[in-house]
């Protein structure tokens, strides 16, 4: 299958980077190369782009899409490791970094990846297929209490306790091997009247995907390391697709903008923690009505941007 992915908030994200033609930029989630291509259009031959992705299919697709550009470095890795990646490339500071945290259309549409609750496929959900932990491992090996906490915390699923119990009961008969089997278990666990609010498996699949790929743990560290690697006035632009991610970005940006831990009664700061960034987006930028109509997957997207000071 061809790697297809419509870049969300494309114009807004590129504008937010305030691109310098000779600058160095990092696309932490290369995907099909949509954002990267627009960055490269604004760079001179002296500028440089580092494209990172943990999915080899994404890197292959991006190389084809960006084949006319010679100032691209492709890195098969997780952006959690951005600090060591730049270290290995002997790059100290960069002028801008973007993260698009959404699952690509390709990953959702290719049934064999196991991300979609709309298509029956083996339980997988690994962004990086070289990793050992898959959705199969989570569903069939995690204890009931662990499953409950994952569904509750990562999926904000109100029926997390019941779904976890139903999963454990079903797997005692036979291992749960496909997304279709999991969807049926979820349907049986959620009362019919609550299944009118979108697909009943949506929150559970989100939660399992986040657990498999350690998405939230990765994000906190990646934001800190990215800010440390920015030049003065460099920008960090992050697109999120659900409230858990957005909350992490919002809170981390606030911590980095106002890190002082002194009591409010202190007349001056004595903790020595200096502000590292200025938040550009007091409220997140959301897709236009037109974009939401054209690309339904953009509806929940939010863009937050900060500037290194």
Curated annotation (Swiss-Prot):
SUPFAM superfamilies: Putative methyltransferase TM0872, insert domain, S-adenosyl-L-methionine-dependent methyltransferases. Its EC number is 2.1.1.199. S-adenosyl-L-methionine binds at residues 33-35, 53, 79, 100, 107. It is an enzyme of class 2 (transferase). It is found in: Cytoplasm. The keyword Repeat does not apply. It catalyses: cytidine(1402) in 16S rRNA + S-adenosyl-L-methionine = N(4)-methylcytidine(1402) in 16S rRNA + S-adenosyl-L-homocysteine + H(+). GO terms for molecular function: rRNA (cytosine-N4-)-methyltransferase activity. GO terms for cellular component: cytoplasm. One of its GO terms (biological process) is rRNA base methylation. Pfam families: Methyltransf_5. Its main location: cytoplasm. InterPro entries: RsmH, SAM-dep_MeTrfase_MraW_recog, SAM-dependent_MTases_sf. Keywords: Cytoplasm, Methyltransferase, rRNA processing, S-adenosyl-L-methionine, Transferase. The keyword Thylakoid does not apply. Specifically methylates the N4 position of cytidine in position 1402 (C1402) of 16S rRNA. Belongs to the methyltransferase superfamily. RsmH family. This is Ribosomal RNA small subunit methyltransferase H. It comes from Clostridium botulinum (strain 657 / Type Ba4).
């Amino acid at each position: 299958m061809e790697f297809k992915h419509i870049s969300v908030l494309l114009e807004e994200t590129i504008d937010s980077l305030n691109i310098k033609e000779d600058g160095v930029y990092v696309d932490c989630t290369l995907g099909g190369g949509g954002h990267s291509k627009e960055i490269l259009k604004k760079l001179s031959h002296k500028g440089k782009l580092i494209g990172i992705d943990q999915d080899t299919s994404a890197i292959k697709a991006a190389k084809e899409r960006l084949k006319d550009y010679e100032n691209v470095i492709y890195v098969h890795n997780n952006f959690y490791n951005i600090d060591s990646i730049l270290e290995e490339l002997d790059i100290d500071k960069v002028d801008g970094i973007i993260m698009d945290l959404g699952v690509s259309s390709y990953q959702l549409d290719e049934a064999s990846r196991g991300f979609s609750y709309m298509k029956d496929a083996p339980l997988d959900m690994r962004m990086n297929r070289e990793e050992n932990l898959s959705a199969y491992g989570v569903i069939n090996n995690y204890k009931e209490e662990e499953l409950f906490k994952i569904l509750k915390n990562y999926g904000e699923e109100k029926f997390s306790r019941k779904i976890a119990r139903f999963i454990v009961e079903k797997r005692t008969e036979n291992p749960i091997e496909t997304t279709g089997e999991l969807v049926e278990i979820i349907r049986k666990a959620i009362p019919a009247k609550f299944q009118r609010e979108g697909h009943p498996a949506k929150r559970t699949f989100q939660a399992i995907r986040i657990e498999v790929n350690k998405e939230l743990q990765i994000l906190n560290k990646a934001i800190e390391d990215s800010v440390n690697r920015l030049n003065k006035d460099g920008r960090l632009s992050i697109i999120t697709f659900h409230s858990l991610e957005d909350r992490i970005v919002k809170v981390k940006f606030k911590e980095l903008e106002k890190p002082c831990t002194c009591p409010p009664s202190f007349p001056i700061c004595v903790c020595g923690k200096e502000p590292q960034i200025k938040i550009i987006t007091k409220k997140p930028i959301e897709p236009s009505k037109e974009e939401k109509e054209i690309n339904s997957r953009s509806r929940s997207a939010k863009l937050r941007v900060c500037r290194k000071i």
